């Protein structure tokens, strides 16, 4: 048992990405008004609840992970199931408690999201596409949550595009993850697009959504985001998204594609964040 094991359990890289999403939502909504309390609180709440969600997901996935990912902290025996449960509960409680310091809307969304993540890990994940939709929704809410923490006039208009991008990119990533986990999911009767429709059809759906995302990706530049957005789009987001699309329609290809999609997601967060700066306009 080590700090490294706990960092792996909470998926610290994904948690940082979620927190950055909240910061981006706040800054875009506030038009880069640097209000430290709102920025830190929104990032902390989102990060803590996301971490709690990842931990509780691993708790319920322990049998599947013994097949798909035996190196993970719980199936490898580095962290016990009981300790993981306690950690998840603590993360959720602290995150919800901190949300009270923002506003009532932030509290409601934090509470609903935490309940949704528990429901997803326990039951909804096994229903397939509906589970994918919930994961995509909660991920996109990290950006929305940051904007809600500022809650100014026209905040919704400013963050709706990055929120939608996060939703669709996460949905695609969940479909690809289902392909990657096909063997373990099949043995444990977990319903995903891959186990329901097959690997090839699931790949096609993911690739169609990725192509559509690529087609509309320049849109934010033409409606107000600055030149930095376009540069990051061309240099990082588009290349790694294309790398995801051209992967072989296999389980191994899905594993590579999911890595590329993580890079696309992080680059997208940075692009929207820097692209909302009030200079370098095209």
Curated annotation (Swiss-Prot):
GO terms for biological process: glycerophospholipid biosynthetic process. Its main location: membrane. It is an enzyme of class 2 (transferase). Its cofactor is Mg(2+); Ca(2+). Magnesium. Can also use Ca(2+), but less efficiently. Keywords: Cell membrane, Lipid biosynthesis, Lipid metabolism, Magnesium, Membrane, Phospholipid biosynthesis, Phospholipid metabolism, Transferase, Transmembrane, Transmembrane helix. It comes from the Archaea. It catalyses: sn-3-O-(geranylgeranyl)glycerol 1-phosphate + (2E,6E,10E)-geranylgeranyl diphosphate = 2,3-bis-O-(geranylgeranyl)-sn-glycerol 1-phosphate + diphosphate. Coiled coil: none annotated. Optimum pH is 6.0. InterPro entries: DGGGP_synth, Prenyltransferase_related, UbiA_prenyltransferase, UbiA_sf. One of its GO terms (molecular function) is magnesium ion binding. It is a multi-pass membrane protein. Pathway: Membrane lipid metabolism; glycerophospholipid metabolism. HAMAP family: DGGGP_synth. Belongs to the UbiA prenyltransferase family. DGGGP synthase subfamily. Prenyltransferase that catalyzes the transfer of the geranylgeranyl moiety of geranylgeranyl diphosphate (GGPP) to the C2 hydroxyl of (S)-3-O-geranylgeranylglyceryl phosphate (GGGP). This reaction is the second ether-bond-formation step in the biosynthesis of archaeal membrane lipids. Cannot use other prenyl donors, i.e. farnesyl diphosphate (FPP) and phytyl diphosphate. Moreover, 4-hydroxybenzoate, 1,4-dihydroxy 2-naphthoate, homogentisate, and alpha-glycerophosphate do not function as prenyl acceptor substrates. This is Digeranylgeranylglyceryl phosphate synthase. It comes from Saccharolobus solfataricus (strain ATCC 35092 / DSM 1617 / JCM 11322 / P2). The lineage of its organism: Archaea, Thermoproteota, Thermoprotei, Sulfolobales, Sulfolobaceae.
